[in-house]
């Protein structure tokens, strides 16, 4: 289901194609790889995403387990083998983004992998 515009914070391991896709839909996107945030520690990025009320998108499973509160609005973890190309990751994200009940993302960690996704409440 599609609805509303969101604010995203894309970790540096997320392909530019996904940033372009979200921006073209009108979403507000901070792309770590494209600016001065590149190379900053995960905890700094996490806090920044949380402070700005953004959805944190990453491929780094370790970044999703930070015991820092408050958490970002939601966390989207892109899973799959390291051999997945930017094209494959973009297609995987697009399939998820076109199916998900977007208004239910807040407060969830979403694990997106080839063939589907799972949502889990963020533990506080």
Summary of predicted features, one role per range:
Residues 3-5, 53, 72, 107:
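A general structural motif
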Residues 100-124:
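Charged phosphate-binding loop/patch that engages nucleotide di/tri-phosphates or the phosphate backbone
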Residues 6-55:
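N-terminal first-folded block
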Residues 64-96:
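Mid-chain, well-packed structural core segment of small domains
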Residues 49-67:
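Acidic, metal-binding active-site segment of PIN/NYN-like and related structure-specific nucleases
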Residues 1-6, 123-124:
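Intrinsically disordered, low-complexity and often Lys/Arg-enriched segments
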Residues 16, 63-65, 118:
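Glycine-rich nucleotide phosphate-binding loop and flanking beta-alpha elements
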């Amino acid at each position: 289901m599609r609805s509303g515009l969101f604010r995203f914070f894309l970790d540096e391991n997320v392909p530019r194609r996904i940033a372009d896709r979200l921006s073209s839909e009108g979403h507000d996107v901070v792309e770590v790889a494209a600016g001065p945030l590149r190379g900053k520690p995960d905890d700094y990025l996490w806090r920044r995403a949380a402070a700005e009320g953004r959805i944190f998108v990453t491929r780094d499973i370790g970044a999703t387990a930070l015991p820092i509160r408050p958490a970002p609005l939601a966390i989207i973890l892109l899973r799959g083998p390291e051999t997945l190309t930017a094209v494959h990751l973009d297609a995987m994200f697009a399939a998820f983004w076109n199916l998900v009940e977007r208004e239910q993302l807040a407060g969830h960690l979403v694990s997106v992998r080839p063939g589907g996704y799972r949502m889990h409440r963020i533990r506080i």
